[in-house]
Amino acid sequence: MSDSRTTTTKNNTTNHKTSRQGPGSACEECRRRKLRCDRQPQCQNCVDAGVYCVTNLARPARGPKKGHLKALKGRIATLERCLLEQRDGMLVDPISDDELLDKALSASSPASQSPDPSEEVSENILEDLDQVFFERVQPMVPILQRHRYFSWAREPQQSANRRGLQQAIRTLAAGVSSQLPEVRVALYRTTRHTLESLESDDTLLTAPDFEQVQAWILIAIYEFMQVSYSRGWMSAGRVFRLVQLLRLPEIDASPLSLLDLDLDPDSKWVVAEEKRRTVWMAYIMDCSLNLRHKGSLTLTEQALTRLPMPESEFQCGHPISMGFLAEALAGTDITSPLSSFAKCILLATISGRTLSHRHLSMAELLRGNPLQDVWTRHQWIDTTLTAHLQLSFSLPTAAESSDPMLLFAKMIGQAGVLSLYDILQSTPWEPETVSLLPDYEACALQAARETVVLARNLRHFSCFK
């Protein structure tokens, strides 16, 4: 009787104990920082840190993926059968153990299925790579909204385009991290296989998706950093052609162009903004590469695409209507301040004009035309570039040093100054014009020194460590 009362008392005590965790799921920021989350719509930890609170309610189930154990059993059965046949002398051609193993594994695995590194990498590492991307890569490649990505990244069923984008995000995140060299190569190979398989699908022409362009942008950057310049150049060319194929620069051609987005109003503007940012990131990549290569641009500045809004409003979900590039260049858009991304676009545009100036000058020299038009165009580009460099960076030095996009924008502007001087050196000028060349040479030397300083400062950012 006494034992019964004791048991009852223990059960009552257990029932009255409160759980250490409140109802609901912890937000992504608290999971990353390993803090106890109060599980409110905007938790106190995120409020104190000044970040947007994101809670992922669709976490994948633990354990092996569906069909994984069945595939392993099939491989084991194939190996056992091959070993029995070899023992009984049924194999006509003698083969080595390695060849036997390769044959058995290839027989049990479908050739069309790409290797998935997530089967070998733990879920915690993959989630860490997502966090690394938004902390170290997103400031330099601001094409994704964090909340929208995490809302679909953990869905059990994803489209092929989104799967390729997620793999590209994790590949580039591993590329900027020095702690996962063994994961980096496997992720890269799998991502390229996924993206190349998308291009072999005829549905690309009828069901285009800009997320495939985003994935190729990230892979091109990874290849410039980790593989080779030529491989990155080829992938960048894919980006430019896909942008043209999907007609992304016409996203703001008319108000009706946004009505084809079959989304709720809260998500529609985010998708439209991501498309704009995808177009402009491809445009900056085009200008930057050709400034080095002295080639011709694939994408033009006449894009019917609004400039990207400031990063803080984009990430926090506060839409702002921005103007067009032509208005910003003319100085007529005073409705909203330009973001560092938009300033980078402006300087890339003016510096990109030196490329067409170079080709026009060469053509006029070959035709024997007078150089007055060349000199007038040269002075106009130089004046415009100098004015925008001074206007875009009338900021405290601390503001520049904390924003990698601003530093990169200034580097593109200095590259335009060097490109102008390179054109001067290859052009036979009239005697009255030669007297101005020392001034341009001094500006070019100053631009070269400034570029070296900017490159050193850029190395201190986490994405380049």
UniProtKB/Swiss-Prot annotation:
GO terms for cellular component: nucleus. This is Azaphilone cluster-specific transcription factor azaR. GO terms for molecular function: DNA binding; DNA-binding transcription factor activity, RNA polymerase II-specific; zinc ion binding. Residues 1-16 have a biased composition (Low complexity). Residues 1-25 are annotated as: Disordered. Residues 27-53 bind DNA. Keywords: DNA-binding, Metal-binding, Nucleus, Transcription, Transcription regulation, Zinc. Signal peptide: none annotated. It comes from the Eukaryota. PROSITE patterns: ZN2_CY6_FUNGAL_1 (PS00463), ZN2_CY6_FUNGAL_2 (PS50048). One of its GO terms (biological process) is DNA-templated transcription. Transcription factor that regulates the expression of the gene cluster that mediates the biosynthesis of azaphilones, a class of fungal metabolites characterized by a highly oxygenated pyrano-quinone bicyclic core and exhibiting a broad range of bioactivities. SMART domains: GAL4. It is found in: Nucleus. The keyword Metal-binding applies. The keyword DNA-binding applies. Its main location: nucleus. InterPro entries: TF_fung (IPR050815), Transcription_factor_dom_fun (IPR007219), Zn2-C6_fun-type_DNA-bd_sf (IPR036864), Zn2Cys6_DnaBD (IPR001138). Pfam families: Fungal_trans (PF04082), Zn_clus (PF00172).
